[in-house]
Amino acid sequence: MANRSRERILKKRDSTPAIQHRNSSAELQNIVKRNRASEKGGAYAVCCAHPIVIDAAIHQAIEDDSMLLVESTSSQVNQLGGYTGQTPAQFAHFVHSAARRIGLSRDRILLGGDHLGPFPWRDEASSRALKKAFGLVRACVLAGYGKIHLDASMACADDAKVVPENIVAQRAATLCAAAEDAFKSLPEGAAAPLYVIGTEVPIPGGELGAGETPVTTTVEGLNQTLRIFKQAFEQRGLSAAWQRVVGVVVQPGVEFGNDFVIEFDPARARSLSAALPRTPALVYEAHSTDYQSPHALAQMVKGHFAILKVGPWLTFAFREAVFALSAIEREMLAAKKRGKLSRVREALDQAMRRKPIYWRSYYHGDEGQLRFARAYSYSDRCRYYWHEPAVQAEIERLRSNLKTSSFPLTLVSQYLPQEYDAIRAGQIEQTAEAIIRHRIQLVLRVYAAACGIRAQPDLFQMPPN
């Protein structure tokens, strides 16, 4: 009997490595309270599963002595693996392992699930898709995710083209019930999940077309959403969970497409900023904030759009650094007339052409235009292909070439002037890894500055208020 009890205890311990500690959840709640009271302070969410981006985000959190909020979407990570091949438990282990290796305390990390709902299974009947969505939410909570975006807004195979908001709210409430049920099985001391609601969300990874303008959420629409969702939660006995709703997704009038960015205009969102509800004590969560200027992001936080999501901009920065290092490699090895060049750009494009599912509906034009878009668009659809073995092999060849033959600072100045300055100032090492990480951190610093976590960012200069 004693041995069985010990086995149960050990099993319980082994099953709790990713349980969310109170510190980061409480910190997000404090950020929300502060922003509501003073229009100051915000949080940015790193919505990316790329290992090098995660590493850069961890380094940035250490540099800023801040919380790190990392979110995975239902398509990236789910109980069936998602396109990254990771379950929520595996993703949590991956993030926590990276943090431990680099030196960030686990209680500084808050994991979030973005667009948790039936989206990955939208081609199935709603009953089947929702059943899988329940499994996804449960898996996230059991893996220690502390921030859950309940998104049941997408139509399934047997739904009308646009799902009525009351149905969306009812489905979101059932997802919440699944999360609450999973939470009950966590060990004592685990922080209760925090929730984000809202139906005015872009398709995960989706953007507007050229010439389209996002419609800013109206105050009437916001109040209707809150009323319908509150009723749906209460009907399922989720009043306590309703008080843990820290964010509602709204459209503040920002978006980006393949070759354009729609900048935040505080005047267009002024009425929404003034309509922050008294209860629950939430702020607005803004999606598709990538490529906004530092000033625009700071103005968003001031207007209570205090949870800023960023994803494609981070892998865009990664791609910029890799392509620039490839150019340095070509110049360097051509001058030395030896060594085999890497073919990162070619391998990436070949991978995209072999499996066009992630970009075909986003890019249009002749083959030349498509090739350009596959590499250089703001929508950054190439982010879905960096993990391909052939692409990884070429990146490794690039890193090996740059490590074997020291690359001249003059070439860094030519292709990566900001990293050149950082190397000259002794801020980073003259290695491919340090350069790539620095490029990503430049973007993260823009968000950290907008959220009041650090001083002015390095990437741009903010105009005065």
Residue ranges and their predicted role:
Residues 48-53, 83-94, 122-139, 169-171:
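Glycine-rich anion/phosphate-binding loops
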Residues 9-43:
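N-terminal amphipathic alpha-helix/helix-capping segment at the start of soluble metabolic enzymes
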Residues 57, 114, 151, 300:
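Conserved, mostly hydrophobic/aromatic
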Residues 42-47, 68-71, 109-114, 146-150, ...:
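Hydrophobic faces of well-ordered beta-strands that scaffold small-molecule active sites
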Residues 68-87, 150-165, 257-258:
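Glycine-rich, proline-tolerant flexible connector loops at the mouths of alpha/beta enzymes
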